[in-house]
Amino acid sequence: MSEPLLIARTPDTELFLLPGMANRHGLITGATGTGKTVTLQKLAESLSEIGVPVFMADVKGDLTGVAQAGTVSEKLLARLKNIGVNDWQPHANPVVVWDIFGEKGHPVRATVSDLGPLLLARLLNLNDVQSGVLNIIFRIADDQGLLLLDFKDLRAITQYIGDNAKSFQNQYGNISSASVGAIQRGLLSLEQQGAAHFFGEPMLDIKDWMRTDANGKGVINILSAEKLYQMPKLYAASLLWMLSELYEQLPEAGDLEKPKLVFFFDEAHLLFNDAPQVLLDKIEQVIRLIRSKGVGVWFVSQNPSDIPDNVLGQLGNRVQHALRAFTPKDQKAVKAAAQTMRANPAFDTEKAIQELGTGEALISFLDAKGSPSVVERAMVIAPCSRMGPVTEDERNGLINHSPVYGKYEDEVDRESAYEMLQKGFQASTEQQNNPPAKGKEVAVDDGILGGLKDILFGTTGPRGGKKDGVVQTMAKSAARQVTNQIVRGMLGSLLGGRRR
């Protein structure tokens, strides 16, 4: 059985996180500069010590220091001595760095189909009507065996469906040119921001996070998010997609002695800001269900009020750093934060929140029965790793000596919707340049668009026989090579994604 993790201390009290309760989720809150990052780092390296892999997003660029041993100083030793810590020893931790843009870590990619229309609609800032059209686009792609892997696939099928909207209207409903235009503008905007890097293959294999090193320590996976953070919706969507991948791919585990992985979601308010209710409902569902897969999710934000109540109620472990109350709204937030913790008769929780110093926190971890412990005021013990970023040379060393180096660096562009539609256009052009011989019957729905539709999606003969088009032929060929192209994953019903 894993030993409890010592996270914080007072001169006469030790506060432990029970490994078996780490997957009951958690919350780290506090104003800027009060010590949230240090707490996050301490929790991450403590979990790593007992063989639990960790994922966390590095928004400020200062978490990578967890890969290097800390530096001993007189000030640090004096602070540790004041709270009764006498056995502190600096050490490094196993770290793999990731980056959606592929600049400061291994590239992270998802296919368009896997992200799904629900998250993509939020990325594109679509309204309900436009989101409905995006769902139709995904449905047509699914029905016709068109793989949506990268941005050019989505652009190509959006343009094709927009140009042929009337052909699909009877089966799928109205596809307005205005909605198609909004989707195309959204795609252009995302592409100009560099978001296209996120879409494609090889897609992230979530099992690459579930590693331990030769000494049995859990690997700490750090997503470089300084640039990504400037695109809040992509930041939130990409991390939520990662959570959904964990849920979809991991088997049911029940209650374990320690989690399979702990996922820290920094700047968590970005996940919920302006999110439609349907997405909020799905987020709540994912958080509730993922616990049974042995995954703990910890949100990091400034205030507990950043988290919707139905999600907040699922976060059993709490670390509350200082909050400032300069306005009536701030005072209300402090009071609400105090009410989320189990009161300690020894002090006024609401008052204490405003008095906490840097690195000091009000802490309530779950006990062995899963009940919140009485809140205690304590100092978070300094991490044994470096508090600050790695150098460029150190980062390059982490990348080049990573166990996944070479797996994600080169993008793969296999045959998908874009290539299928391009072949259809080429075949249609050839048909236009070589019209039927004189006297032969010409299809009623002639012209380049009608001809293209027949070439792409096939024709029906006078006796009802179906002749496959380019799409069907290529899809059948691809299906023989790839057994799981368009199969919906379990989370497809949750987030609208489709397995490749």
From Swiss-Prot:
Disulfide bonds: none annotated. InterPro entries: HerA_C (IPR033186), P-loop_NTPase (IPR027417), T4SS_component (IPR051162). SUPFAM superfamilies: P-loop containing nucleoside triphosphate hydrolases. It comes from the Bacteria. To E.coli YjiB. This is Uncharacterized protein YjgR. It comes from Escherichia coli (strain K12).
